[in-house]
């Protein structure tokens, strides 16, 4: 793993230890509420004709720093929903991405779309936490989990009513993810070791993945031509965050990206 990924995972172990000590609880203003039933993240992507869009609410990242200074996750999510996207991704990592679990609750309550908890999952406690906070899906990163963990966490997430997006970056991780029985595979075009981006990563890995497993392309998607190529290659969905956050009106950006 890269230095930054090592640091993130080390911090997650600290967070899990604290979670184990303190228990899982909701913020006071949400304590009496219970999230609506799971909305079917995977099914939402599959039911859309053409390339589905997962729009991400992302305030910052380790590689790019602050992305959106005036960050309002509810306003962002409502705008995404009006634009016709199929799902929303919410960063919940606090220390490296300036995210917050509260954002997950707030977004889930504000929109009718399925919501992905985007974080670095290393323990089943985080799955319980994600479920309590209303996540319809969670991210499992093959670079930080072994095959057994990928399988066990996916199965446990399903017991809790959540889908799992298993993220890979290279062929070795893809083989591990497929062996774990994943049913929704994400290809991160950003190399977590050096944070370089290569959209061709998706097309290389597409050749390894059975057509019955939906594929999601993540990171570095900035041009309409990229989305057209993804659709032509049989990719199910594109996860787009920074491009939408940086380039003004999400509606205008998506209209440009979706143009024929």
Curated annotation (Swiss-Prot):
Stretches assigned to coiled coil: none
Keyword vocabulary terms for this entry: Amino-acid biosynthesis, Aromatic amino acid biosynthesis, Decarboxylase, Lyase, Tryptophan biosynthesis
Pfam families tied to this protein: IGPS
Gene Ontology BP annotations: L-tryptophan biosynthetic process
UniProt keyword Transmembrane helix present: no
KW Amino-acid biosynthesis (keyword) present: yes
EC number: 4.1.1.48
Protein family (similarity comment): Belongs to the TrpC family.
Name this protein carries in UniProt: Indole-3-glycerol phosphate synthase
Lineage, opening ranks: Bacteria, Pseudomonadati, Thermodesulfobacteriota, Desulfobulbia, Desulfobulbales
